Design a protein with these regions (language model features):
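A basic/glycine-biased coupling hinge at the interface between accessory DNA-binding modules
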Residues: 1-5, 22-25, 30-33, 44-215
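Pre-Walker A adenine-sensing motif
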Residues: 8-19
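Walker A/P-loop
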Residues: 36
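Post-Walker A alpha-helix
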Residues: 39-40
């Protein structure tokens, strides 16, 4: 495949980044400097000139919009093979991994994902179960604390060990009840998609090895 077009319209620094030998690199650049162009052309170079299979490509973004933009640019460079690449957000990639690995954690692969409104309703039900006043412990506020803990990869047991007030104690108890109810329903929330994927990769070396080998 002719790959000369991949270097067209790139400045010297971008060209160096795109055409560097396969390996690990960190590209630092400011806003509007062409980072997405470098990433997409780098992927194109790896697939076209370095023997990397499209299915071995993992390109992660923070937003769905950025993922769509990257897919569109890659399709312009490589065509339909882009459909076999993993070009998506962190949550989408972790969700796909979790669909395969969920049975290791006691879920089935057909687990459901609870939306924001249902998450808050579930927290409210947990507060009622614990006989806590929802006026003192606003469900949305307790949910925000649980979400923040998950984003720091702090599970219910570890959170309980860090309590410093009655409010913290309540959040910890709700957190435990909330996770128990989710698991009983074979459900996860948006934050679980990241936290549970990390848990799988940390607890099960064979899973980590599989996914490390899956991408180049």
């Amino acid at each position: 495949m002719d790959v000369s077009h991949l270097l067209d319209a790139l400045n010297p620094a971008q060209r160096d980044a795109v055409s560097a030998p396969p390996g690990h690199y960190l590209v630092l650049a400011g806003a509007g400097s062409g980072k997405t162009r470098v990433l997409t052309h780098r992927i194109g170079h790896l697939v076209s000139a370095c023997g990397v299979r499209p299915s071995e490509v993992l390109a992660i973004t923070f937003t769905n919009r950025a993922a769509r933009e990257m897919v569109e640019r890659l399709e312009g460079l490589l065509g339909g093979v882009v459909r076999t690449m993993w070009v998506m957000t962190f949550h989408a990639a972790c969700g796909r991994i979790l669909r395969r690995e969920a049975p290791r954690l006691g879920y089935t692969s057909s687990f459901s994902i609870v939306d924001q409104a249902d998450q808050v309703r579930l927290v409210k039900a947990c507060l009622e179960e614990l006989d806590r006043d929802p006026k003192r412990f606003a469900p949305s506020g307790v949910h925000a604390q649980i979400s923040n803990a998950k984003n720091r990869l702090v599970g219910p047991d570890r959170y309980m060990q860090q309590v410093a007030s009655f409010y913290d104690q309540t959040v910890a108890e709700v957190y435990e009840a909330y996770q128990r109810r989710l698991a009983a329903s074979n459900a996860v929330d948006f934050d679980d998609m990241l936290m549970l994927t990390v848990e799988v990769l940390e607890r099960f070396p064979d899973a980590l090895d599989h996914w490390q080998r899956a991408f180049r």
